[in-house]
């Protein structure tokens, strides 16, 4: 009798823990970013990072190669200088612990203007796994792609490696290495190395970057110190630049567990020179940033500020121009969480556009943004809506309304959304729909469709009102996967298309 009781209690505890995990929200709204947790979703194992990103209201599949044009892709907050389309379509959601969609991180990350960050935190396996993949593109141009990806996890060391080569009107080579070393429970070191080499008809370019991030936890309360050092060199046919940087950041509870503080210093120094002229531009930034978050069971309040001391030196021949000034990015946000499924956000953000090197006068332009957002999430259903109003100094004020929804049922997932942009010069909109069917015998069929109204910038540039991509994949056993994408399919039927981009891309992948 005793043994069955023990077994029954064990099953009850297991089911309770599983219910608690499934009850956690897929989406978590923070003051300056939205967190997505793929491990809390119902996954088949074949979902990609690109599939998950279609849940976000602001992100759109604007083209086969133009996926996240407004976002800088990072892994553990380090820029990932790789083939973006390949990474998004190859990285599996089951290997991702957390996705941070950082749309207003001017305080925490020092983003400039409308720039945004897409930060990926990996879920490392207990051993080595990865894949080797080859692709062939057949359309107006013929393309060949080779890629290899590896993940390795152990108690003290994690390793992520990705390399790819693309031949299409030139050569593109990418390499990314990321290692995590855990020395003990309170000390870890993250190191990064990325390299890209592009040999295109318009010239050659290369970029090399190295970075190290050291974390030390002082106590059981979670007081943590972060130290960062890095260097990047970039060069193309017209210019070259050097960018060393350093960061020191402290994250800690303050007086009470409900109040969290981030205090940091960042220094970066960008030195750019033109190869065909005597023009050069050096920018030196020294930032101090401070942010407080006070969390109650149903409310979260955040206020932050980044004071940016900068000096710009521009030289052209014997003429030089210098400007030193101070500016500050700021945010203030309140989030109401009535229960674990619903979240409502109201926020204010101030940020700046940097002047371009080619501008005659160095002048910053400020951006003031108001944001109202709502998120609802369950394991198989998410709904997100967002309204933003931008007041842009020296530019046109803009209102953006966005909505997206994700629904998963047995054998089928549906993702859709819409974006509306309202300005004095005109109104434009887009509507997108992306269903995926998981069929018997390891078949998968997916479709991406995006419709643009007449005044939408993407439609004006391409002449095509609809973007479409049809994908078919088949898994053979544990190791082999074959797929084909027919992308930009509506270009073939549109007489107004400026460039006929429709093509078939065939993929063969071996997993180990």
PLM feature spans:
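Short strand-turn segments of transmembrane beta-barrel domains in outer membranes
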Residues: 42, 126-150, 163
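N-terminal periplasmic accessory domains that precede
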Residues: 49-52, 86, 111-134, 146
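Short acidic/polar hinge/loop motifs at secondary-structure boundaries
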Residues: 78-105
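Surface-exposed extracellular loop regions of Gram-negative outer-membrane beta-barrel proteins
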Residues: 124-129, 180-188, 192-195, 262-270, ...
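Repeated loop/turn-to-beta-strand initiation elements of outer-membrane beta-barrel proteins
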Residues: 128, 156-160, 185-191, 219-225, ...
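Transmembrane beta-strands of outer-membrane beta-barrel pores
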Residues: 135-140, 154, 165-169, 193-199, ...
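Flexible loop and strand-edge segments within Gram-negative outer membrane beta-barrel domains
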Residues: 168-247, 281, 353-355, 360-364
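Outer-membrane beta-barrel "beta-signal"
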Residues: 333, 373, 498-512
